[in-house]
Amino acid sequence: GASLRPPLAMPVDGRGAPCYRATMSYDDVKKPRFGWALTGSGHFFKESLDIMRRLPDLDVFVSKAAAEVIRMYRQELVLPPETRLFKDTTASAAPVGAFYYGVYHTLIVAPATSNTVAKCVAGISDNLATNVFAQAGKCRVPTIVFACDTAPEMDTEAPKGMVKVYPRRIDLENTERLKAFEETTVVESVKDLEAAVEARLKWLNTANSSS
């Protein structure tokens, strides 16, 4: 019953202070939502946040590593008041239960660390980000993953500026493996992320107008 379902949201922002607190229950969710999982990656982190802020009907899942990145990059999750934030506070990642009840039509994991991608490929779900990815897959929820390690040599943003990184072969192989997962679209750039999100929005608008 509804009393056994986990709470819909926990507050979090870049300083650990309360940000938004959801009071609605699963039964109150009339319209399926976007889910967005933040991991511990700083790769185009600010750009990913900009895209995230433009989405309607949004829930944001913040892993413990993501909360650290938010502080390091001096970012704040300034989002519309109706956005719900979930903090990684329990070993079982209780908020993922919402996927069973049709609360989400789309999951976006962006940006995704090589560690997150590796765990997703291996079927390991031991934090909030990997848990929501696993549950989205089990519930056939289409998922977009913005992978960080996609080329042998890359420029990425560190807290103090751009740096050069050289992803390992295993990192590149895991990104390729993830592309074969059901209901999963892997993107490799901010431009591709924007295009994938826009395509999803257009599909949803078409589906809503025909229903």
Feature roles, as predicted:
Residues 1-24, 210-211:
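N-terminal amphipathic/basic-hydrophobic helices that include classical n-h-c signal peptides
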Residues 20, 24-210:
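A cross-family phosphate/adenosyl-ligand binding-site feature
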